[in-house]
Amino acid sequence: MICPRKKRPIKDEDFSAIVVPSMRGHGYLDYTVESHPSKALQNMDELRHHEMLCDLVLHVTYKDKIVDFKVHKLVLAASSPYFKAMFTSNFKECHASEVTLRDVCPQVISRLIDFAYTSRITVGETCVLHVLLTAMRYQMEEVAKACCDFLMKNLEPSNVIGISRFAEEIGCTDLHLRTREYINTHFNEVTKEEEFFSLSHCQLLELISQDSLKVLCESEVYKACIDWVRWDAESRAQYFHALLNAVHIYALPPTFLKRQLQSCPILSKANSCKDFLSKIFHEMALRKPLPPTPHRGTQLIYIAGGYKQHSLDTLEAFDPHKNVWLKLGSMMSPCSGLGACVLFGLLYTVGGRNLSLQNNTESGSLSCYNPMTNQWTQLAPLNTPRNRVGVGVIDGSIYAVGGSHASTHHNSVERYDPETNRWTFVAPMSVARLGAGVAACGGCLYVVGGFDGDNRWNTVERYQPDTNTWQHVAPMNTVRSGLGVVCMDNYLYAVGGYDGQTQLKTMERYNITRDVWEPMASMNHCRSAHGVSVYQCKIFVLGGFNQGGFLSSVECYCPASNVWTLVTDMPVGRSGMGVAVTMEPCPGILPEEEEEVDEEM
């Protein structure tokens, strides 16, 4: 017996029963296949390769070559706002089965079509610029961004100028900004590459006019201009004076400027330029007040070493504008009682000692920190170790003043020549001074206060490097050792210190013209063995020690209002550190910002 086959139900009424998911009928099915979009694209790509259901032929013309691509309008429109507008906005191409793309490389279009169907693109570095240009033309933002990211990661001194000009021409703002940042940060390296010499005088002028250039010394900017002119002296000499006007001439070291006037072949043929520089050099030589010179790049306050229970090897930098502390490359060995200064953009630390439970060694070392590389270099040591040494800079030389070695307190002074990497003794002071304040002003070195092992001083001596002689000037109103001294606007400021009985919070100011000291506003906290520096026409005082212990507080003095303000705290309280101001480290070596931590009391 053969049973008849049931007819397969195809309509609702063909079903003998209806299954309800829930008694109330409120249930629903929510199901997602994560792989569906990629599978759908994969199927579309297979249809394209088999030329099935394609509704458009792209005729791509480049020079004398025409290449055809059969595609689906829907896929192009979904991947490119350019094609979406073409096929949906009543343009003639909306109903066309053929469209011509002119003056675009077929290989590049092929890569972009592949991306539209596969969401993947692979491009050799020689083709990235072509793909970027075409992706921007057809508004394929993901591809353009991928190309920009690739170029940003592969910027080098040899290619950055070309990429920067290309990005500017095609309107790729993010890439252009990044290349300008790279050029500013690596200016000295970029100016050694061939692309640099292809700049027009207007482009070079625009570049060196930026205060955001990161250079250790303004001589790097001057040399770049000289090299650019020398590349084609016959046609470029006419632009030299305009370029010099963009160089911060007053920031050039006098010794460097003197050598240029004596031996630069470009200057010897440019009388107006030579006269211009000669006038400025004579102003420097006569110690005339010079106009303020803006700094290149952001400046930070650097704090090296110091003491808290033991000598420290830390190097930190403080950005007063952002109220941020940066931890940088550690010193070569722990050190406190050191001096610090900046010469040609480099941070130098001089002398000090390494004091701990296991060690107490005075140091004669000279170390140099380069903010462009975050690296330390060891240089020629002092002729004698100097703890609690004073340091100053005059005419491209570093002076190490006084200090102590074991039980000996020094009245001797040494001068360091960075060109020969040698220390030599100069005329000694009239008395030994440990913990004196030292500052350079008007081409002279002032040494203020200090301690000779028996006496604390209020006396002040001034050193004339031209005659290698010392002379006394008006003494302070207060005996001070462990004080901080800075020069600002032709005044010396003596801040804090120790008078033999207690730490001081008072400050007095020396009028160099009138040879008198006058009291000024006092700090909020008493302190000695603190750090002090001038930052953007204000005095910053950091750390130190008083009867309450090691200080972490930072205070700022405004001479216009004669007021001290508490600013922030250092990550760790300390005394006896070296403090100086120079350019911020390059972005590639900056660590992440660290949270401030409370000082242990």
Swiss-Prot record:
GO cellular component: Cul3-RING ubiquitin ligase complex; cytoplasm; inclusion body; nucleus
Gene name in the database record: keap1a
PTM description: Non-enzymatic covalent modifications of reactive cysteines by electrophile metabolites inactivate the BCR(KEAP1) complex.
Swiss-Prot/TrEMBL site (Sensor for electrophilic agents) positions: C127, C264
Comment on protein domains: Keap1 contains reactive cysteine residues that act as sensors for endogenously produced and exogenously encountered small molecules, which react with sulfhydryl groups and modify the cysteine sensors, leading to impair ability of the BCR(KEAP1) complex to ubiquitinate target proteins.
This protein's record includes keyword Disulfide bond: no
Ranges for domain BACK: 153-253
Origin species: Danio rerio (Zebrafish)
Protein keywords: Cytoplasm, Kelch repeat, Nucleus, Repeat, Ubl conjugation pathway
PROSITE patterns, A to Z: BTB
Kelch repeats: 292-337, 338-388, 389-435, 436-482, 484-529, 530-576
Summary of the tissues where the protein is detected: Widely expressed.
Pfam families on file: BACK, BTB, Kelch_1, Kelch_KLHDC2_KLHL20_DRC7
Similarity section: Belongs to the KEAP1 family.
Protein name, entry field: Kelch-like ECH-associated protein 1A
GO biological process, one term: ubiquitin-dependent protein catabolic process
